[in-house]
Design a protein with these regions (language model features):
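Cationic, amphipathic, low-complexity segments that mediate targeting or membrane/lipid association
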Residues: 2-4
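Short, positively charged and aromatic/hydrophobic N-terminal segments
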Residues: 6, 11-23
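Nucleotidyltransferase catalytic core that binds NTPs
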Residues: 22-23, 27-230
Length: 230
């Protein structure tokens, strides 16, 4: 009797596994531009490609971008790349939280199809063709005023990633609202045929906007940060 139950359970398990692999193919991970481009070039032109660039240390806010992309697009691409050119302090770059193993599992669970996880900085910047963009006060006020050069670094890396992935739609969280406007403006100025979409802020139970850097805050700092939502 136990053997029969085991066999029955195994058959059901095998059927389920086959179903998952057929209808829910595993996420593909690429570490080089070349391999990623080759894969994306094999996708039918009529399929809509969505893209969500991240710096990793993923949370529910990032995953909401993947799910929104899944709703609107046929293929969902995500990148994890901690971009050094947008950090003002070396220590901030070096201490940025990283957990690629967990990030990969989270992306799989959210339904991501393709992950670009470059080996190093040169893998992203190797073919850069620098473009001078003047966006005026949009990049000089608020965060731009307190972090000189930050948005230049953001635009550089996002343009590179757009050039590599060639998405139809790109998804960004509205938590970084100024950054969203900068990227949207950049795409328009450069005549990129990419629809830059903003997605709603995802918050913790206490109302604080989810952020990868939240884990670096002390309990007191987390409490003080709640004033930002008022």
């Amino acid at each position: 009797m136990r053997v029969q139950k085991y066999i029955k359970k195994s058959i059901i398990s095998n059927i389920y596994t086959s179903f998952v692999h057929h209808f829910c193919p595993m996420m593909k991970i690429f570490k080089t531009q070349r391999a990623l481009k080759e894969h994306l070039s094999s996708i039918e032109e009529k399929l809509v490609v969505g893209f969500a660039p991240t710096m990793g240390s993923l949370h529910e806010g990032h995953l909401s971008l993947i799910r929104e992309s899944k709703k609107r697009c046929d293929i969902v691409v995500c990148s994890i790349f901690v971009n050094p050119t947008q950090f003002n302090a070396v220590s901030d770059f070096e201490n940025y939280p990283k957990d690629y193993v967990e990030d990969i599992e989270l992306l799989k669970s959210a339904g991501c199809d393709v992950l670009f996880l470059p080996n190093d900085v040169d893998e992203v910047y190797q073919n850069e063709k620098k473009v001078s963009l003047e966006l005026g006060n949009l990049v000089n006020v608020l965060e731009g005023e307190h972090r000189p050069g930050h948005f230049d670094g953001v635009m550089r890396v996002v343009k590179l990633l757009f050039d590599i992935v060639q998405p139809d739609k790109a998804f960004f969280g509205l938590k970084d609202f100024q950054q969203f406007l900068v990227i949207q403006k950049m795409a328009k100025v450069l005549n990129m045929e990419i629809e830059v979409l903003g997605c709603d802020i995802v918050r913790e139970e206490n109302g604080l906007a989810m952020s990868s850097r939240n884990k670096r805050l002390s309990n007191t700092e987390l409490k003080n940060a709640l004033v930002l939502q008022k």
